Amino acid sequence: MISSLLQVALGGALGASARYLTNVGSMRLFGPAFPVGTMIVNVVGSFLMGVLVVVLAHKGNRYAPFLMTGMLGGFTTFSAFSLDAVTLYERGQAGLAAAYVGLSVGLSLAGLMAGMAAVRGWMA
């Protein structure tokens, strides 16, 4: 358990650092008009999650805590969201997958807006 926790912590630090560098680099290249860095991180993270799911299924998942939960979790949680949605779809639960995607996005946006409204009201 401690070994897995350390793997997740180290991977998370590396993933978060990679996310930060990607965002800083994209801001310098493309400017702040569109969140290119976040889009890059989400697409690349989802691609890498797809690669790791297949590779680790064949090679063993000894490094899954470091690579999947740690590095990709620190890099982007969108990769885990994408994996969950595709897993539901591949299990033949397309309706549940669609509901998961819709609810996740909708409720996350609502949660963000509620948090912002709560703090703005408190700080006013």
Swiss-Prot record:
Membrane-topology annotation of the record: Multi-pass membrane protein
Localization of this protein: Cell inner membrane
GO molecular function: fluoride channel activity; metal ion binding
Broad class of the protein's primary localization: membrane
Keywords: Cell inner membrane, Cell membrane, Ion channel, Ion transport, Membrane, Metal-binding, Sodium, Transmembrane, Transmembrane helix, Transport
Catalysed reaction equations from the record: fluoride(in) = fluoride(out)
Pfam families recorded: CRCB (PF02537)
Residues annotated for Na(+) binding in this entry: 73, 76
Ranges annotated as spanning the membrane: 36-56, 63-83, 99-119
Record-level GO BP terms: cellular detoxification of fluoride
Family: Belongs to the fluoride channel Fluc/FEX (TC 1.A.43) family.
Official protein name in the record: Fluoride-specific ion channel FluC
Natural source organism: Cereibacter sphaeroides (strain ATCC 17023 / DSM 158 / JCM 6121 / CCUG 31486 / LMG 2827 / NBRC 12203 / NCIMB 8253 / ATH 2.4.1.)
Taxonomic lineage: Bacteria, Pseudomonadati, Pseudomonadota, Alphaproteobacteria, Rhodobacterales
